[in-house]
Amino acid sequence: MIPSPTVTEALCITGGPRSGKTGALVERAAAWAEAIPAGPVAQPPFLFFCASPVTIDDTTSRLSQRGLADAPAEAAGPAKSAACQHGPRTSLCTGLVTTPFDYACRILADPLAQRATGRGGRVLSQAEEAVFYEDLKTCGLKRRRLRELWAFLQCGLVNLSDSDPDWIQTTEEQAVLDLARSILIFEEAVLPGEAVNLAVRALEAEPALRQRFGSPVVLADDYLLMSRASQRLVNLLATGKIAVAGSEKTALPAFEPYPCATGFAEFETAHAPLQRVTLEAPFRSLERAWEAAPDLAGEMALIARTIAEELAGGTSPDAIAVVGTNRTWRANLQRALTSVDIPAAPMRHPAFKAPKGDLAPASDNEREHVLRQLRDSITRPDDSHGSRACTRAGINDAATRNNPPASPCAGDSIAWRQWLSFDDALGRSAAVSELRRIAQPQGLNLAEALAALDADALPGLPATSPFTQSLLTPYREAQRLLAKRSGNDQPTIVTSPAAAANRARESSSSSKADTALSLANLTETRENDAAATPTSPAPAVAIAAPEDLFGHTFEVVIFGGFVNGFIPSRDMCDPGVIVGGARVRQEATDRDTIALAEQRATRRLLFTSFESCDLETAERLRLHIPRIRLRNGVRTCDIEPSNYLQELNLGIRQTSGPTDQSHPSA
């Protein structure tokens, strides 16, 4: 690890879950911030990094009580400036609370960072990343192999392995990586998983960026839940003092999919001598129990009855969480609770999730959203300020020759690619691949290439080509819709053959104006998740996957579906399917899942299971089936409680009564 050469004090706080690590960081932030001399500042007095967006509000609330941060609603977001705007410091000046990912996007918005990395554009949303993955399938690899290979490459980027000359060892790996970079450059895009990597490379290449975005005090919570790239970013930004905190016990990934478990060791090596503080978690009296129901319907009735008793005793619905590892089980439980007038809502946890499977059919709302993006990114003829222009950074000469600045009239390349994916994702991926092969050597991005193609000014792709027709049909449909909806404020797309032919030669004059990185959709994934989750003023019981519990605490946590097939999974129940190191890692993950549920409960933790299920349901839920019986003409499977149950030392099991046949899930 390459630390900042100006760091004068380093602190590492370790301890178990809920041992007061965040509180200790807040106290240290207060002490260090008070010691900063007053005067004009261009940097925030401190940066506080959280491993997940979930914990930002809580951390900001704690800091605001000390006068060190704005209200939680004003917590640092990716679209705001990273500089402290409070002028001369006469008292404690508020710092910034953010995540490494959001702050990396701030850094990439700087023209100096863009020149250092040679990359412009904006960060892809989750839906846009899925389209990118569709384009990646044109490499010709089988889906499973491509998925494995892409996971390896993504892991390498967040672990900064791209600086190792021995990282890529096969032609196959190099081909996929080159294709991915070609697609991203053609569409002027940045993958969420590479944003922190690019920011680190920019900081290492340009010391001026450290001075501009660094801070005299940097703090990082849940340090071991960050990737190596995020940890490196935190260290590079510290210009005076740095403190990190985290638990050395293994834990489920919170936000970033590839956390670096060796972060403390690397931190100690980089900042020796190091001050260490170890905190002990106080004893917590937690009521732990396990109850079993005769069947699946009985378990849901048991959970509903338990929640009803808690609500009758005065427990707030939002202080109760029901955890299950199976998505279908959680959906059925939510319907069952709602039908008996128990408010319940799914909990969603923001995370970098790799696209899987085929693209889902686009809804009307998605089409409207993309059309708005296109409308806002296309410059009107009378728009003298270019407020709707898609801008990109000026970069070094070699990169400029290959990637000339985008035309302000062609539109957002990412939005155009999203629009082309509607209705025929597979065919359009092949067509865009052919368009990229011809247009990219001419210095055109996707939006410019489509404009040239529409004007029949793109040599190499004749109008009679089926690829041309596949692209121009939706392209012209979008133009028609934009013209219809804009009316007098109609945006136009320059399709002049002369303009398309000259775009590759406009780098010199245009690059001076093209200095901003468009991050309009940076938080689109998170906003879409919030929009998909129905918000109600009334509190509701949380229905969650185990990883969703991170950053939250509940009085009562019910771990339902605690059976073989759910945890451990069906494949884990067969000793011959998952073996060796993979089995050891999965067992560790399962135990971390159970531990997280226990850590998030403050008063009561209840495990529930069921003893039987019909064969059809068992197969649909992928339950482990040790034995099948015929009961009343129905093939019924015996379902065993989780193999991890004996490790919990819960004593004699409590079996609930017979199923209430009037219950909606029965």
Regions found by a protein language model. Name each.
Residues 1-19, 23-24, 45, 114, ...:
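Accessory N-terminal region flanking or inserted into the helicase ATPase core
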Residues 4-42, 271-347, 359-364, 368-400, ...:
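Helicase P-loop NTPase motor core
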Residues 14, 41-152, 175-178, 266, ...:
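Conserved P-loop NTPase-based nucleic-acid remodeling module centered on helicase motor cores
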Residues 48, 97, 241-247, 607:
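Structural recognition of the conserved hydrophobic beta-strand(s) that form the central parallel beta-sheet
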Residues 54, 223-227, 249-250, 547-548, ...:
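Catalytic acidic motif of RecA-like/P-loop NTPases
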Residues 104, 220-234, 251-253, 551:
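Catalytic P-loop NTPase motifs of RecA-like helicase/translocase cores
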Residues 217, 221, 376-638, 643-647:
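Conserved helicase C-terminal RecA-like lobe
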Residues 231-301:
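Conserved RecA-like helicase ATPase core segment
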